[in-house]
Amino acid sequence: MNNKKKIVKIFFYDKILFFLLISLSIIGIIIVSSASISFGIRLHNDYFYFAKRNLLYFFLSFFLFFQIIRIPINQLEKYNKIALLINLFLLIIVFIIGNSINGAIRWIKIGFFSIQPSECSKLILFFYISDYIVKKNKELKNKLWGFLKPIIIMLIFVILLLMQPDLGNSLILFLTTLLLFFLAGINLWKCCFMFLFGLLTIFILIIFKPYRIRRILSFLDPWEDPFNSGYQLTQSLMALGRGKIIGTGLGNSIQKLEYLPEAYTDFIFSILGEELGYIGSIIILIMLFFVIFRIFLIGKNSFIQKKFFSGYFSFSVGIWISLQTIMNVGGVIGILPIKGLTLPFISYGGSSLITIFSAIAIVIRSDFELRINKYQAYLKQ
């Protein structure tokens, strides 16, 4: 009898989204294995050092995924404020005990692992905002403090991230919160005010940080200074150019031989394009599109069944993955400034992979509960 119940439960999970999730992660493991070889041998005397760690992160993410989808959404909601406070604490202590890499203080080292609290911030803040929109909807729309409270919390997170500095994740937090408020029916003038405030903040940050001005200028014309501010982008474009239509073949990248910095993290799409070509790159982007589409579909179905928390959270995850993909790929191909963001599911990074697996586990759990409710309603007819 228990086995039959398990089979019925498996039937109600979104198998397409799960298949896309696993497929993209396996592709990521393969590309990271190729892109990180020269870095592994130079830094750790092991060709597959980063590949093995990435595989470990995948199994850990997979384990957490299967733990989370077993927990009812209403139980997860109880812990959103505790999770918010813990994440806020980690974002503060990262400045005290964190490791600095390439001038950024984003990682807390615990044994063999490094935690990046800024990655966890996306999941935890969007969970909190989604819960707040549902439980405090009238206050949010009608009272000034009700509107300002989540804005202040979001701005605290954004400021702490900007201090690291982490402009990419700060933008994702800000823009996703803004779009969630718009989706919730918040007054258009309030949303416009938030947007203009964000633009003004970005403008001020660019003016007072010379390296950000150089990034903007190098994005506009990377070939003007190809060996300094434009180096990453020119090397990235060269990698994509070498790939042409069908690519040089898996493992045959030249740019990964330390010509392109961050080849296995932020710029992995360049190596993917070089080795798998235009066709391989498009296939990956199509798969990412369908992941986002399935998540938005779950969000829409949640609203139809009046499961508003699941709806807002699903949309927040879809917006987050959309923005992160656009910013990463846009930076790599030279149509947007480089933000230092990973490509979801593909880039090397334990915190990034674990966080995104956890977020999608909650989305799939939401969808599971919708399907169960629909099935039970059908049986009662």
Curated annotation (Swiss-Prot):
Its EC number is 2.4.99.28. Pathway: Cell wall biogenesis; peptidoglycan biosynthesis. It is found in: Cell inner membrane. Coiled coil: none annotated. Residues 37-53, 103-109, 165-166, 209-278, 339-343 are periplasmic. Keywords: Cell cycle, Cell division, Cell inner membrane, Cell membrane, Cell shape, Cell wall biogenesis/degradation, Glycosyltransferase, Membrane, Peptidoglycan synthesis, Transferase, Transmembrane, Transmembrane helix. GO terms for biological process: cell wall organization; FtsZ-dependent cytokinesis; peptidoglycan biosynthetic process; regulation of cell shape. GO terms for cellular component: cell division site; plasma membrane. Disulfide bonds: none annotated. It catalyses: [GlcNAc-(1->4)-Mur2Ac(oyl-L-Ala-gamma-D-Glu-L-Lys-D-Ala-D-Ala)](n)-di-trans,octa-cis-undecaprenyl diphosphate + beta-D-GlcNAc-(1->4)-Mur2Ac(oyl-L-Ala-gamma-D-Glu-L-Lys-D-Ala-D-Ala)-di-trans,octa-cis-undecaprenyl diphosphate = [GlcNAc-(1->4)-Mur2Ac(oyl-L-Ala-gamma-D-Glu-L-Lys-D-Ala-D-Ala)](n+1)-di-trans,octa-cis-undecaprenyl diphosphate + di-trans,octa-cis-undecaprenyl diphosphate + H(+). PANTHER family: CELL CYCLE PROTEIN, PEPTIDOGLYCAN GLYCOSYLTRANSFERASE FTSW-RELATED. Peptidoglycan polymerase that is essential for cell division. Belongs to the SEDS family. FtsW subfamily. This is Probable peptidoglycan glycosyltransferase FtsW. It comes from Wigglesworthia glossinidia brevipalpis.
